[in-house]
Amino acid sequence: MDAAITTLGPRARGGLHRFANPGRFLRLAAAVQPWLTVPAILITLAGLYWGLFVSPADWQQGDAVRIMYIHVPSAWLASLGYFLLACCSFASIVWRHPLADMAAVEIGPVGAGFTGLCLATGSLWGKPMWGAWWVWDARLTSVLILFFLYLGHIALVRAFDDPQRGYRAGAILALVGVVNLPIIKYSVDWWNTLHQPATITLTGAPTMALDMLWPLLVCTIGFMLTFAAIVVARTRAAVMERRIRGLLLARSEAAE
């Protein structure tokens, strides 16, 4: 890692070294964990109650539309999680960042969980709307590929006796899989799919009624905080486990 970092400027090197310090990360994670976990629980519960029990039914879909309050945030977090996984993989390859390796390993299962939730709720939503649990359209297929990319990353980083080889192989797979993200995003525009175009965009006003939009946004914030809280907790545990193993190994070598 040091050899790669020396190619950067002094200020960048100092910033990377500070962030890569396990003790500093553990202190930061311990400080932010309660501020992530408690709001995540409260906001998610509030959003789900608002969406599932208070918001109105859709005039076409009826109460089936309430699946949206779980499905849509899960779909957004599935793609966002993979983008973060790719960013950590890039940092791992370019700067040999140890925390990037551990964060990527811990993001994988969380992202896979949200992707699986997206697929499951989408299937439940699709049955009453389309008359089938599954349809091989572009959006569904690309999200399924995303799920397999997550599973492939999880398997690949654990497939080698040398952890560094596993980290490198997983990072390469993650970066190659980034090409799937724009396919997921724009599949409804590029191909004729059963999914409707995006109702919330950065360039225009949302086409969704406000009494449905607000609980959806609250659920999304809650899901994002939940994702962050789980990843921080898992990465913190991974760093602590590595430090404990290092201490035990040092004691064993000293005893010999």
Predicted regions and their residues:
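Polytopic transmembrane helical bundles with strong interfacial aromatic enrichment
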Residues: 2-256
